[in-house]
Amino acid sequence: VTAVADLFAGTSRVGHALKSRGYRVLSNDHNAYAHTLATCYVQADHEVHAADAERHLAELRLLPPAAGYFTRTFCQEARFFQPENGARVDAIRAEIARRAAAGELGDDPARAAELEAILLVSLMEAADRVDSTTGVQMAYLKAWAPRAARDLELRLPALLPAAPDGKSRALGLEAVEAARQAADEVDLAYLDPPYNQHKYLGNYHIWETLVRNDEPEAYGVARKRIDCRERKSPFNSKGGIAPALAEVIEAALSGERLRYLLVSFSDEGFLDRATIEAMLSPHGEVEVISRDHPRYVGARIGIHNPAGERVGTVGKLRNKELLFLLRRK
């Protein structure tokens, strides 16, 4: 195996880890924040961008604060960040957009897009280090987190060199479309789809807004983007997830090159072990590995009302991740 596809890339930790081990990676996610992370951590190569990125970051660090949409929405209407840091985010985001539009990130469009992604990821991660949350953006803490008092600090993301097998790529497609591309490009596809009603967009809605820079209508205490409410995915419904996952599996197996599928799913998900095994077993030998994990952070904290008070009780604190490895016939 020299090339791997990650079809639900999310934060790109898997794709970054694979690239660090020398694999050529095809990383896909339809959310803009996730595609930006993949462009930075999977597609962009250290030897191409590190020096230019550090030069731009050094200049961006010197910008004076300039409060705008981000400050108003996430620091005043909500309390995710201190206003001083919010105003710096606004200023830096506006300058990245200006440089991109003015062609100051390079003459080659593909390389300029990679450099823009690196700068945006640096800003996302800088803001993440000074937020007042438990790690996801469904809610902010009732009392300020100590780290929220720190100053925003831009750092160069951990870029990696190109893989020996060739350039890695980031896609921003629906999973089934990316699977069709992967079928003849990679040896193994990794599928880690949403497994219940919780949308990743809602967990990271601030990063989606920061990357898109579209100043959307916001709602609720957390000031989520309106499309968190409007965008629907079959993977987030009991009735839709089985046919949606089956379609992605069939698409990934539609080509000649791909020999292995690795599917990750939680025992808290809408599908049980037997259902997933039944999807995979007609195509070859299936091995199932079970691993014990702490539950996601929101489940461990419990449910809170709009006033920030806990309601109800927390259930079990651990769950099982099931890994289904298909070796194709």
How does the language model describe each region?
Residues 1-2, 22, 116, 184-186, ...:
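A general structural motif
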Residues 3-78, 87, 91-97, 117-120, ...:
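SAM cofactor-binding core of SAM-dependent methyltransferases
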Residues 4-18, 27-32, 180, 184-203, ...:
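Conserved proline-anchored active-site loop of SAM-dependent methyltransferases
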Residues 16-17, 36-39, 181-184, 199-208, ...:
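A short acidic (Asp/Glu
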Residues 75-204, 215-231:
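SAM-dependent nucleic-acid methyltransferase catalytic core
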Residues 232-287:
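Conserved Class I SAM-dependent methyltransferase catalytic core
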Residues 272-329:
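C-terminal catalytic and target-recognition region of SAM-dependent MTase-like enzymes
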Residues 26, 169-171, 287-289:
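General small-molecule cofactor/ligand-binding pocket signal
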